[in-house]
């Protein structure tokens, strides 16, 4: 989950060139439906790609098929597609916050919104989480929608925390929205349910928890080396430092590491367990393998 710079591609100029270039496979269809495509591009720009305000599936099947072809095999006017694919967002997935991006995908799914198949502002670097949300981009009311990495400035704020409950040796992991005045909790929760929970985030955090259980410093890297017994104040300081480091490393507070650490910071039970674990291992009263 990360705010990205909006691509500077002049999509409307490219559309006009495609309309007049007889060497382009889609030219006859774009020429026939140019006014529709032009209006749809303007609609997207005026509404920041909001799925509640952008109406899809109004172009012909023939044009849709040609646009899909161009997306898979871009010609010279569409080189920006290859550039977006190659540059990506190498430090974090803009949709879910994982430390990976493997592809370029559509914010508004091409199955339901074919008008924007090659539209640069609808093409976002992503990991496999975007395909796992399938065609779900909005819910039952206009507060329920997936965040748009190009347009949702709230992504620069901390929006999501992990939560840990039950037996802290192997806790139940979930996600909670962090309220702020810029976006409804319902929007954050929809993104959590539609994107985060369908990703591998919970499995990743479960694995990280077990690594932390064996050696807390492996995950909370700001804990000093050596046989130092920590106070709760020490631990809280190290957690905040680590959270800040991960925010800076990934250039967003909504990466998986920061969500994980934020969940510990916000849980008295998790912090006490971690403090007891760290000090017990340091003093030899707890085996890292127990």
Language-model regions: role of each:
Residues 101-185:
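Glycine- and acidic-residue-rich phosphate-binding/metal-coordinating active-site segment common to enzymes
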């Amino acid at each position: 989950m990360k705010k990205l710079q909006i691509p500077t591609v002049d999509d409307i100029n490219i559309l006009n060139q495609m309309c007049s270039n007889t060497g382009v496979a889609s030219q006859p269809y774009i020429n026939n439906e140019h006014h529709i495509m032009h209006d749809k591009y303007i609609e997207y720009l005026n509404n920041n790609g909001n799925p509640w305000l952008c109406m899809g599936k109004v172009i012909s099947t023939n044009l849709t098929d040609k646009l899909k072809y161009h997306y898979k095999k871009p010609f010279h006017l569409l080189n920006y597609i290859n550039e977006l694919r190659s540059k990506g967002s190498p430090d974090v997935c803009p949709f879910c916050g994982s430390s990976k991006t493997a592809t370029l995908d559509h914010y508004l799914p091409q199955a339901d919104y074919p008008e924007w198949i090659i539209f640069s502002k609808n093409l976002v670097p992503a990991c496999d989480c975007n395909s796992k949300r399938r065609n779900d981009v909005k819910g039952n009311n206009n507060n329920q929608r997936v965040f748009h990495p190009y347009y949702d400035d709230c992504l620069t704020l901390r929006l999501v925390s992990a939560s840990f409950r039950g037996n802290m040796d192997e806790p139940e992991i979930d996600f909670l929205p962090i309220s702020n005045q810029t976006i409804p909790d319902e929007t954050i929760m929809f993104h959590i349910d539609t994107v985060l929970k369908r990703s591998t985030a919970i499995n990743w955090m479960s694995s990280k928890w077990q690594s932390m259980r064996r050696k807390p410093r492996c995950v909370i890297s700001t804990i000093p080396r050596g046989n130092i017994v920590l106070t709760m104040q020490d631990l809280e300081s190290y957690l905040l430092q680590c959270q800040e480091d991960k925010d800076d490393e990934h250039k967003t507070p909504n990466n998986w590491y920061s969500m994980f650490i934020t969940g510990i910071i916000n849980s008295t039970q998790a912090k006490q367990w971690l403090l007891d674990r760290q000090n017990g291992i340091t003093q030899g009263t707890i085996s890292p393998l127990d």
